[in-house]
Amino acid sequence: MSTSLTTCEWKKVFYEKMEVAKPADSWELIIDPTLKPNELGPGWKQYLEQHASGRFHCSWCWHTWQSANVVILFHMHLDRAQRVGSVRMRVFKQLCYQCGTSRLDESSMLEENIEGLVDNLITSLREQCYDEDGGQYRIHVASRPDSGLHRSEFCEACQEGIVHWKPSEKLLEEDAAYTDASKKKGQAGFISSFFSFRWCLFWGTLCLVIVYLQFFRGRSGFL
């Protein structure tokens, strides 16, 4: 069975970020389409992402649609003694509401979306497997255009009993404030660098003018 591009991208991003987050431990990411919510073995932890943004493509009628309600289930386990961890992952599918086929279709995601989702996964992993403060989660539903209301009858996750939550206004405001603060910080850094460059350019030009005047003054005295 061929491996989809999205699956390869998930593994690539996960391994790169885990190498930075926990370089002393060895982690693996396994795609498991049979994963069930809340069915955990001893020592396993769960993280559920309910509002990922993805695009679906019907393999029967070629209809495409965008959804901001893609559900992704993660089960995580860390063997502290062996320093080996495992993440099992399932991306829930959706049915095409255009042609009504019973064939479930997989979603595709942009790399930037996958990176944000992996950041959330690592945040949960730090909290549940390492007892650390993982940091702030990113809320992907904010500013994600959707193709319409979520239709639970076409959603695999809804059919298996996963109830979608909606982030509160407070969480959305915090997420927007976090994004604005990051942008302002970047702009401030750019402005600071710009003025530092202009200041150095000014002093460099002034030094050249002084050297130039001294040189010609010396030549005038010699003549």
UniProtKB/Swiss-Prot annotation:
It is a single-pass type III membrane protein. Residues 1-193 are cytoplasmic. Predominantly expressed in olfactory and vomeronasal organs, in mature olfactory sensory neurons. InterPro entries: R-trans_p (IPR026096), ZAR1/RTP1-5-like_Znf-3CxxC (IPR027377). The gene is Rtp2. Keywords: Cell membrane, Membrane, Metal-binding, Transmembrane, Transmembrane helix, Zinc, Zinc-finger. The chain crosses the membrane at residues 194-216. One of its GO terms (biological process) is protein insertion into membrane. It comes from the Eukaryota. Specifically promotes functional cell surface expression of olfactory receptors, but not of other GPCRs. This is Receptor-transporting protein 2. A zinc finger (3CxxC-type) spans 52-161.
